[in-house]
Amino acid sequence: MNNPIPSNLKSEAKKAAKILREFTEITSRNGPDKIIPAHVIAKAKGLAVLSVIKAGFLVTARGGSGIVLARLPDGKWSAPSAIGIAGLGGGFEIGIEVSDLVIILNYDRAVEAFAKGGNLTLGGNFTVAVGPLGRNLEGNVSLRSSAAVFTYCKSRGLFAGISLEGSCLIERKETNRKFYCQDIRAYDILFGDVPQPAQAEDLYEILNSFTEKYETEGQRINLKKVAREQRKAKELPPKPSSRPQPAHPPVQLNAGSQGNRNEYKLYPELSSYHEKTGNLNQPIEVTALYSFEGQQPGDLNFQAGDRIIVISKTDSNFDWWEGKLRGQTGIFPANYVTMN
């Protein structure tokens, strides 16, 4: 395991890069389902990487060191700020254990709370959850978590559950002062007042790789969506072959059968719903099962799920009917809809 004893910021950045690789690369001990997904880090608003030592005898004490970074408005990562972690816990654990931690800050408010206050108590005002594992979890329901903080812990090379409730991330002001050669607060570091240091080049290289992996995964997912849409389009039912021909000019309906209303039929060869039933108060409404994009003038465009008012219809579902949607009137294939 890595050294939990506080050291200079250059060493902490080097340690953080090593820990991130161990948490995200597939090895003989880490299969594809045992790594931090690239998109979790790519979407993170902030990130803390630490080594922690835990000692227990009736009461457990936890302490360690590491760094924290924040995502800047331009999408780049800030310079690192040195941090420590401290906490107490109950239980009857006896012994000493060293662990590596990766803490994902999912919201800007979690980053701001640390940056402005110089410390952040986990589980206080922010919900903490064990982070998801596996590189193919982008669409997984479990990722729709509202947790402000994800935690990952490795002990003896294996992922392990760890409760960080009550643990506090603490700003190491003196370490930052020595590295940046000035009195500077975590707030200024995390909000971009100093450039990325060359001494942390290895760390930024691996952080940027997560964004590249995530974008590649996103492109692959989009290609799958396009392929699904193309397959779906090919599976659309065939449209009726013969189309009704519009009258020029439209034919006036029998005024007596329409309650003395002056209405006109654009497609007189289609039977009027009102003429057949005499029901003026309850027009037929159908719901689109498929999307239909008109290919000729007079076609009625609609999306799957749209509700269409039927103006004229035939007795066959494999035919063209006339309908009205969002103020537009036109004909559509009846086998693309279902009666409500």
Curated annotation (Swiss-Prot):
Pfam families found in the cross-reference section: SH3_9, Ysc84
Expression tissues: Expressed in skin, kidney, stomach, small intestine and colon. Highly expressed in the anagen hair follicle. In hair, it is expressed predominantly in the hair bulb, the hair shaft, inner root sheath, and outer root sheath in the lower half of the follicle.
Record protein name field: SH3 domain-containing YSC84-like protein 1
Coiled-coil ranges per UniProt: none
Record PROSITE patterns: SH3
Transmembrane regions: none
UniProt region (Disordered), positions on chain: 226-259
Biological process terms in GO annotation: phosphatidylinositol biosynthetic process; regulation of ruffle assembly
Biased composition (Pro residues): 238-249
Basic and acidic residues bias (residue ranges): 226-237
Keyword list, A-Z: SH3 domain
MF term (GO), any: phosphatidylinositol binding
InterPro entries named in the record: SH3-like_dom_sf (IPR036028), SH3_domain (IPR001452), SH3_domain_YSC84-like (IPR051702), SH3YL1_SH3 (IPR035511), SYLF_SH3YL1-like (IPR033643), Ysc84_actin-binding (IPR007461)
Domain SH3: 281-340
Assembly, per entry: Interacts with SH3D19.
